[in-house]
Amino acid sequence: MQDEWQIAPRLSINGGVRLEWATEPEEKYGRDVALPNLTDRAPTIGRLYENPGVNVSPRGGFAWNVTGDGRTSLRGGYGLYYNTNNQQNLIVTITNPPFTPRPVIASPTFPNPPFNRAGATSIRPMQFDLEYPRVHVWNLSAQRELPWQTVATVSYAGSRGRHLLRSNDVNTALPTSLADGTPFFPAGTPRQNTAFSTIELKSSD
C-alpha cells in the first residue's frame, strides 16, 4: 500500500507500508530436526524454527522545490526491506541426526584402522528464535539547474543491515588464560555441549 500527497505547492511526500509473511518450511515426512537450546543433549524432531510472523516494511520520501522556480530541489527517502531465509541453510538440515548421522573421526591415523570415532555427531541446526534479515536504506539528494543544460547533484545514500544470516560452530571449547592473559586451549579440552562435536548454527544473531 502506497500513496503520494501534494501537501504544498512546492512540497510533495509519499509513504507506504508492505506486509510480508513467509511460511515455515516443512519436510514432507515430518523429519525436520531442531536444537531449540544449544545445551540440549539431543535434537528435537519437529519444526525447524519459530516463524517470526508478519514483517512490516514502511517506506517514505519527499520532494521539495526549494526556491519555487523549479531549479533547486531537495529529495529524500527511507525504506525497510526484508529478505527470506537462505535456502541453503534449510537444505543442510537434512543431514542432521537422528535421520542422517554425521559422525566425526577423532584420530584418523591410517596405519591404525578402523578409525577411532569421537563418540559424538555434528549437527547443523537453525537458530530457533530466528529473525529474518533486513536492511534499512535511506538517501538524501540536492539538485541545482545550471546553465548549458547542466544539473549539479550532491547525494548521500546509506544502508544498514540487521540480523544478517551467518554460520559458525558455536560448540567450541572454552579457553583458559595463561598468566599474561593469553587465551589457551589445553589438549583434550571438552566442548561446551559434550553430546555433540560441532554445532554449526545457522543464525541471524
Region annotations inferred by a language model:
Residues 1, 10, 199-205:
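Short, intrinsically disordered, charge-balanced linker/junction segments flanking boundaries
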Residues 28-57, 61-202:
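Solvent-exposed loop/turn elements at secondary-structure boundaries
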